């Protein structure tokens, strides 16, 4: 039975690596996957999901305008799709998460979504909030804070490495801008 999975974490926990491994596992068995990633994420080449380990795969791009159910249904009619994988799922709209549930419930295709739970201020992304509410399975991928504790949060840093305490929720960046932290260190830097 197909299900909607949400793999969530802070940054640098290996979400993209896990997605690429899952896709490979399907493909190794002769099954077809459809990988999607956010158009807004320009850290790597457009139309690619890439891991810091150096592996990557081609991906379809999504933005706020795409109807994921219709897009997957069209692709599925042309070639049977056995699994849909979504990278950067925090950037999905609530409506797009509903579309993912339709892919599972109506097309009977499993969907594996990977994303960050909270932003640099500790607020939930709308896509992540909807996935936390509606996914059949929730899986936390763990990373660690510099102190060795589990990192549940992420801070955004300015050019001087100082924690930013305001700004737009979405600002794409990598290790040079964001750092995963445990709650205690996050509170010290952001909630002052």
Curated annotation (Swiss-Prot):
Protein family membership: Belongs to the thymidine kinase family.
Residues noted as binding Zn(2+) in the record, renumbered to the chain: 145, 147, 182, 185
EC category name: transferase
Active site: 88 (proton acceptor)
Organism, scientific name: Colwellia psychrerythraea (strain 34H / ATCC BAA-681)
EC nos: 2.7.1.21
Pfam families on file: TK
One Gene Ontology term of the molecular function aspect: ATP binding
Domain of life where this protein originates: Bacteria
GO biological process terms held by the UniProt record: DNA biosynthetic process; thymidine metabolic process
Stored InterPro entries: P-loop_NTPase (IPR027417), Thymidine_kinase (IPR001267), Thymidine_kinase_CS (IPR020633)
Chief location category: cytoplasm
Keyword Cytoplasm tagged: yes
Binding site for ATP: 9-16, 87-90
Annotated protein name in UniProt: Thymidine kinase
Subunit text: Homotetramer.
Subcellular location: Cytoplasm
GO CC annotations, alphabetized: cytosol
Alphabetized UniProt keyword annotations: ATP-binding, Cytoplasm, DNA synthesis, Kinase, Metal-binding, Nucleotide-binding, Transferase, Zinc
Record field: catalytic activity: thymidine + ATP = dTMP + ADP + H(+)
């Amino acid at each position: 039975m197909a299900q909607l999975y949400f793999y969530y974490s802070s940054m640098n926990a290996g979400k993209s690596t896990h997605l690429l491994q899952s896709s490979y596992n399907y493909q190794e068995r002769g099954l077809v996957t459809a990988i999607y990633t956010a158009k807004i994420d320009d850290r790597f080449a457009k139309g690619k999901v890439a891991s810091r380990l150096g592996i990557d795969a081609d991906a379809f791009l999504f933005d706020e305008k795409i109807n994921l159910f219709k897009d997957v249904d069209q692709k599925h009619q042309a070639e049977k799709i056995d699994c849909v994988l979504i990278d950067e799922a925090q950037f999905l709209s609530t409506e797009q998460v509903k579309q993912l549930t339709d892919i599972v419930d109506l097309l009977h295709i499993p969907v594996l979504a990977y994303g960050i739970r909270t932003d640099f201020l500790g607020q939930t992304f709308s896509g992540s909030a909807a996935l936390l509410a509606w996914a059949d399975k929730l899986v936390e991928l763990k990373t660690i804070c510099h102190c060795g504790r589990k990192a549940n949060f992420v801070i955004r840093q300015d050019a001087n490495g100082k924690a930013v305490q305001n700004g737009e929720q979405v600002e794409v960046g990598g290790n040079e801008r964001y750092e995963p932290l445990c709650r205690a260190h996050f509170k010290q830097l952001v909630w002052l």
